[in-house]
């Protein structure tokens, strides 16, 4: 890949600012506010802890992937055709259907596969805005980008295990429970294993950031990268996992991908150049609505099909996350395709 510029989205500087500023700032502000109860010792009720996750069904979370049927063809060719709709449909049918079946036959491996897939996807979800919105100059090779994906994805997926091992175990166990599975006492929950994981991941975080600082000619962008990384380290270490992941999913990961999906829609570029973000956002909402509704209907089918249907808020939220898992695998395929076309990978 070398040091050649990244061929991301063809936006003017004004249009890029219109997208980037709210997409980045919303995450910074929301994460900071959401950390306050934990930092000040306030205990949230179960309803409050699960509220962001429940809200994600309609607020950015589910919709950010529901736009795949349009985002992929727009990124690849700039136009949407029946052929492209069929391509995305087949991706979801084959990958999502296969993964859904895996939950019924091997729920515990499927649950940990979800953690691994999400680690990759949330890492790649932060790579794009670093390159396009912050214009970092030190992620100029695939190994450096892969290292950043490893760190950024590990913040929401690994750090909660370090800070809240028992809650982490209960969440993963709740994934498998509707399908008759149980996590049990795996080595990853052993205190010594977690200690070594924490030391290794902290060292890797410092090493990746230090390497970027040595290479950058734009220290301001690097400082934002480092500040985001530190913010997320603290957030996921001190905030209970379900609440932390729900907030992050809604207002950090999903919002940044929504901005990316808007960026590949050429019809809204004039609005972005004029400084208008509300019009493009409304268009996104309309376009994402049909597939969001279809995904929620699929959730109802999943609820009916599992051997042990949920009876509590916790188990219901866990099954919702299984639905997210089933949809995440084909979504990762779509985003990876976009990454290849746009020069991110």
Swiss-Prot record:
User: Could you say which residues bind Fe cation here?
Assistant: 64, 121, 253, 257
Q: What is its main location?
A: membrane
Q: What transmembrane ranges does the database entry give?
A: 24-44, 52-72, 85-105, 111-131, 146-166, 171-191, 192-212, 231-251, 286-306, 318-338
Please name the InterPro entries in this protein's record.
Blh_diox
Q: Does the keyword Transmembrane helix apply?
A: yes
* Phenotype of null mutants: In-frame deletion of blh reduces bacteriorhodopsin accumulation on solid medium but not in liquid. However, deletion of both brp and blh completely abolishes bacteriorhodopsin and retinal production in liquid medium, without affecting bacterioopsin accumulation, and the level of beta-carotene is increased by 5.3-fold.
Q: Which UniProt keywords apply?
A: Cell membrane, Dioxygenase, Iron, Membrane, Metal-binding, Oxidoreductase, Transmembrane, Transmembrane helix
Q: Name one GO biological process term.
A: retinal metabolic process
A GO molecular-function annotation: iron ion binding
Q: Which GO terms describe its cellular component?
A: plasma membrane
Catalytic reaction(s) noted: all-trans-beta-carotene + O2 = 2 all-trans-retinal
Localisation: Cell membrane
Give the top-rank taxon of the lineage listed in the UniProt record for this protein.
Archaea
List, alphabetically, the NCBIfam families matched: blh_monoox (TIGR03753)
Query: What family does the database annotate?
Result: Belongs to the Brp/Blh beta-carotene diooxygenase family.
Q: What does this protein do?
A: Appears to partially substitute for Brp function in retinal biosynthesis during bacteriorhodopsin production. Probably catalyzes the cleavage of beta-carotene at its central double bond (15,15') to yield two molecules of all-trans-retinal.
What protein does this entry describe? Probable beta-carotene 15,15'-dioxygenase Blh
Q: Which gene encodes it?
A: blh
């Amino acid at each position: 890949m070398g040091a050649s510029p990244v061929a991301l989205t063809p936006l003017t500087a004004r249009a890029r600012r219109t997208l980037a500023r709210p997409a980045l700032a919303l995450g910074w502000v929301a994460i900071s506010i959401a950390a306050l109860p934990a930092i000040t010792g306030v205990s949230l009720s179960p309803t409050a802890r699960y509220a962001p996750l429940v809200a994600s069904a309609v607020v950015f979370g589910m919709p950010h992937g529901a736009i795949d049927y349009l985002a992929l063809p727009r990124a690849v060719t700039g136009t949407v055709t029946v052929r492209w709709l069929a391509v995305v449909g087949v991706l979801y049918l084959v990958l999502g259907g296969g993964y859904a079946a895996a939950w019924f036959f091997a729920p515990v491996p499927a649950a940990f596969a979800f953690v691994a897939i999400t680690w990759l996807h949330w890492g790649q979800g932060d790579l794009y805005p670093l390159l396009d919105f912050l214009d970092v100059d030190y992620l100029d090779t695939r190994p450096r980008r892969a290292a950043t994906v490893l760190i950024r994805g590990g913040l929401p997926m690994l750090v909660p295990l370090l800070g809240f091992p028992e809650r982490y175990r209960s969440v993963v166990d709740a994934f498998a429970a509707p399908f008759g599975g149980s996590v049990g006492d795996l080595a990853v929950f052993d205190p010594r294993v977690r200690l070594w994981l924490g030391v290794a991941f902290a060292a890797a975080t410092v090493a990746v950031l230090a390497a970027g600082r040595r290479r950058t000619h734009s220290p301001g962008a690097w400082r934002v990268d480092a500040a985001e990384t530190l913010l997320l380290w603290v957030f996921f270490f001190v905030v209970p996992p379900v609440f932390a992941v729900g907030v992050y999913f809604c207002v950090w990961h999903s919002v940044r991908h929504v901005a990316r999906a808007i960026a590949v829609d050429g019809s809204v570029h004039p609005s972005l150049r004029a400084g208008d973000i509300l019009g493009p956002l409304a268009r996104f909402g309309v376009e994402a609505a049909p597939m969001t509704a279809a995904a929620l209907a699929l959730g109802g089918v999943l609820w009916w099909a599992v051997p042990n249907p949920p009876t509590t808020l916790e188990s219901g939220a866990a099954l919702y996350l299984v639905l997210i898992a089933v949809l995440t695998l084909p979504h990762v395929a779509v985003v990876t395709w976009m990454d290849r076309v746009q020069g991110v990978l």
